[in-house]
């Protein structure tokens, strides 16, 4: 979907319409471009210049690379307290006071109850970083390009991020990427997670207790977390929350995530209206290195913020109309009866047998819901992880027996990516700790259910299989509290 008229004036005109402060003039909207486009390539050149200059700054400079990285999360090989003391020995140093306020503030990755702030927090961070690049480079017309990896033709890391010997692009190179990524292989072939737009199928922004986990949480899972674990290692790369923002591709990735949010809103998706959401304030750093506070209510529309996207995305076929949810529900117990309560995920596929609630005939209710064109969801609820397992988990509905299902199987529902698997311990300096609250995931499976019904399957309540994409790390034992099949 093309945003008409946004590019017509060209880059030269944009230069004339932006003030020296790095902020667009009132009423001026600048486009963020696909990095593969000519305009996006110009923006990438400016971005690389800015990254290089930021990396050359002292680590304690609020405008510098390390400080900006730590806003997202302090690396997990040190505590926040130790890092503050290292960079600011004087406890009254203004830089230390600012760092105390802004480091480790991406709460959505650390506390599942804060997941609804995932999108506005990153929008604020991205906007502040964008303005910082303008100030550092003098290119006041700069906008953050986006990496359009949802297009199958653009799933290789842009070549400029893979050029360690080129002086211009060297600041964009990192070694802590998965094998093959820096060789130009498509990341969905190298990694474990798909890169579709199924999150846009959700009709509501936030979690609903018995069905849809919501657009925000689903987008956080995929393609957001998918890209993180597909690109970088889970030790000190994009696949680890506390190291992710050290890879410059982080910024182009989140520009695309922001574009998906804006696209969902343009399609009719509504953001929360409660004051607890709208009134939340976060602190960042402005282009002068001073603190700046932003309220969620002020960043829900990109136009007043001075930017738009050159292209927006349509919702995928099979998306659930806005809004609605109620109805049919099935709950889980384990097929082997070895578990009472939570199901523990191990190194082998885990099968969970669903059973029907209520007294009316199971198949009749399924067919009634399907004939009424009601959407179906599969909800994976209460996921608790005390240690990063180093793998993702594919979800399959009613897999055929005696087969090893994979992502091309007819039973494939989606993938659970555990990018933010544990609470980041640097808030207290005590090291990682288990989640206090569990995460919820959901998948729209309307077409899958209808196809299974047409094939004569689902004559009995189906099973759900969770398949690790590799061998989990020793000691990792994720648990799932409940699984539900819901029709709205």
Question: Where in the sequence are the language-model features?
Answer:
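C-terminal accessory segments of proteins
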Residues: 18-488
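N-terminal export signals
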Residues: 1-19
């Amino acid at each position: 979907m093309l945003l008409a008229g946004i590019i017509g004036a060209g880059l030269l005109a944009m230069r004339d319409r932006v003030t020296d402060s790095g902020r667009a003039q009132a009423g001026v909207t600048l486009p963020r471009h696909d990095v593969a486009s000519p305009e996006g390539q110009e923006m990438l050149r400016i971005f690389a210049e800015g990254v290089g200059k930021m990396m050359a700054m002292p680590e304690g400079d609020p405008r510098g690379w390390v400080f900006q990285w730590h806003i997202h999360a302090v690396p997990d090989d040190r505590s926040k307290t130790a890092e503050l003391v290292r960079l600011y020995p004087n406890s009254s140093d203004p830089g230390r006071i600012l760092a105390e306020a802004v480091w480790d503030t991406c709460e959505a990755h650390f506390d599942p109850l804060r997941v609804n702030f995932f999108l506005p927090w990153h929008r604020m961070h991205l906007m502040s970083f964008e303005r910082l690049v303008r100030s550092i480079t003098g290119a006041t017309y700069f906008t953050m390009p986006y990496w359009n990896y949802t297009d199958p033709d653009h799933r290789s890391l842009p070549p400029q991020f893979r050029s360690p010997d080129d002086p211009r692009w060297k600041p964009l190179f990192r070694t802590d990427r998965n094998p093959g990524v820096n060789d130009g292989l498509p990341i969905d072939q190298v990694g474990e997670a798909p890169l579709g737009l199924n999150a846009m199928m959700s009709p509501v922004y936030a979690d609903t207790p018995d069905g849809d986990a919501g657009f925000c949480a689903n987008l956080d899972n995929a393609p957001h977390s998918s890209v993180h674990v597909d690109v970088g290692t889970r030790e000190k790369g994009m696949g680890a929350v506390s190291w992710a923002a050290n890879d410059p591709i982080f910024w182009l990735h989140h520009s695309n995530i922001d574009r998906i949010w804006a696209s969902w809103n343009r399609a009719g998706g509504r953001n929360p209206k409660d004051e607890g959401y709208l009134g939340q304030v976060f602190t960042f750093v402005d282009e002068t290195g001073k603190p700046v506070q932003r309220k969620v209510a002020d960043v829900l529309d990109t136009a007043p913020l001075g930017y738009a996207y050159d292209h927006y995305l349509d919702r995928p076929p099979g998306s659930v109309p806005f809004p609605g949810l109620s109805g049919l529900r099935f709950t889980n117990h384990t097929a082997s009866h070895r578990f009472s309560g939570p199901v523990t995920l191990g190194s082998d596929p885990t099968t969970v047998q669903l059973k029907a609630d209520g007294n009316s005939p199971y198949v009749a209710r399924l067919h009634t819901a399907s004939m009424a064109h009601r959407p179906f969801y599969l909800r994976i609820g209460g996921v608790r992880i005390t240690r990063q397992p180093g793998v993702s988990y594919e979800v399959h509905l009613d897999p055929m027996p005696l087969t090893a299902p994979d992502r091309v199987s007819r039973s494939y529902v989606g993938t659970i990516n555990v990018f933010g698997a544990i609470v980041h311990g640097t808030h207290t300096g005590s090291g990682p700790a288990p989640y206090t609250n569990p995460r919820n995931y959901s998948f729209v499976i309307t077409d899958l259910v209808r196809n299974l019904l047409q094939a004569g399957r689902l004559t009995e309540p189906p099973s759900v299989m969770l398949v690790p994409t590799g061998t989990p790390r020793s000691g990792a034992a994720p648990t799932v509290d409940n699984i539900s099949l819901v029709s709205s």
